[in-house]
Amino acid sequence: MSEDLYEDDQDSQVSSGSRHPMAERFRGYLPVVVDVETGGFNSATDALLEIAAVTIGMDEKGFLFPEHTYFYRVEPFEGANIEAAALEFTGIKLDHPLRMAVSEESALTDIFRGVRKALKANGCKRAILVGHNSSFDLGFLNAAVARNDIKRNPFHPFSSFDTATLAGLAYGQTVLARACQSADIDFDGREAHSARYDTEKTAELFCGIVNRWKEMGGWRDFND
């Protein structure tokens, strides 16, 4: 499926006359930062264990900022594979009494509800996933959507913004912790590999790169 064909199918969601600054900035797409923690690398077979999403806002001067965070610990789907090495890497304890995990469907339904609210507020037609090595997060998101037969997915199915690539361009760093350090963003390695922490830091990094580009004259909004 070509991107143009996909976008044509979505055009009816937003008036062609919409001039909201966020919609203008990203061609009708709203950046939403997503991070997942999983039981392995295979989105079809391995468990989704945590998911977090941060919606992005824009101030009156056209600068981006992290707006609202959604975070869920997720129950592994029936028959899901969970590698011991993955649990050791993330530090997730599935039997922790305070884990309070919810189903994939419940987590995605609530996140998608919040994303659709943000889409409406910003005059955007579709969310675009922002992630650090974004294809990984998008793959697990799409797999969970398909597994739960969720019909209304606000995210573009294959396009994304990858902060590993953007940080490589802006700072010469592709590892999240090092990119944040180069961008003067505090990063605590002890908190890393929590979906919530990584998502919030990725959101700061993304906003910082986009805002820095604007300050350098690389983006002029329609009021300039």
Curated annotation (Swiss-Prot):
Binds two Mg(2+) per subunit. The active form of the enzyme binds two Mg(2+) ions in its active site. The first Mg(2+) forms only one salt bridge with the protein. It is an enzyme of class 3 (hydrolase). Its cofactor is Mg(2+). One of its GO terms (biological process) is tRNA processing. Its EC number is 3.1.13.-. The record marks F41, F89, F136, F158 as: Important for substrate binding and specificity. One of its GO terms (cellular component) is cytosol. Signal peptide: none annotated. Residues 1-20 are annotated as: Disordered. Residues 32-206 form the Exonuclease domain. The active site is at H193 (proton donor/acceptor). Keywords: Exonuclease, Hydrolase, Magnesium, Metal-binding, Nuclease, tRNA processing. Residues 1-11 have a biased composition (Acidic residues). It comes from the Bacteria. Mg(2+) 2 binds at D35, E37, H193, D198. Mg(2+) 1 binds at D35. One of its GO terms (molecular function) is nucleic acid binding. InterPro entries: Exonuclease_RNaseT/DNA_pol3 (IPR013520), RNase_T (IPR005987), RNaseH-like_sf (IPR012337), RNaseH_sf (IPR036397). Trims short 3' overhangs of a variety of RNA species, leaving a one or two nucleotide 3' overhang. Responsible for the end-turnover of tRNA: specifically removes the terminal AMP residue from uncharged tRNA (tRNA-C-C-A). Also appears to be involved in tRNA biosynthesis. Belongs to the RNase T family. NCBIfam families: RNaseT. Homodimer. This is Ribonuclease T. It comes from Pseudomonas entomophila (strain L48).
